[in-house]
Amino acid sequence: MNALVHKSLVVQLQAHGTERFPVLAHLEYDADDPFAVTVVFAHDGRVLARWKVDRGMLGEGLTKPVGVGDVRFRPVADGPSEELCMEFYGDAHADGGRQHAAVFMWASAVAAFLRETHAVVAPGEEEAGVDDFLAEVLAGS
């Protein structure tokens, strides 16, 4: 079984005060970093942003709001469709405000991607690799 999972989706980006517009989102899961999903947003062949997000939070965000920091997820019911809203917050401004952008993805597509990642590394079976790291560090000293 492949240790990498890729999925490309057309998603909707909405920056502060703008209408939604389509961009590509490339989702990647690598079993070598089992807790993370890398998401690359691109438009007109240009990378707009690259984020590494927690796989567990991504899954939880399909059913309930999660996150309190720079990245937050929440489900959105948009008529007959279910979406996942990924919200990204920038650094604070002098006035206390923050830049904010939201990305809306079909929840079913994200759920399908996560099922593929779970086939590679099941939830709860992830290993942080701390013991291996410490062994390497101690062997070098």
Model-derived features: where do they sit?
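Charge-rich, low-complexity N-terminal segments
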Residues: 1-40
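Coil-to-beta-strand transition motifs
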Residues: 32-35, 81, 96
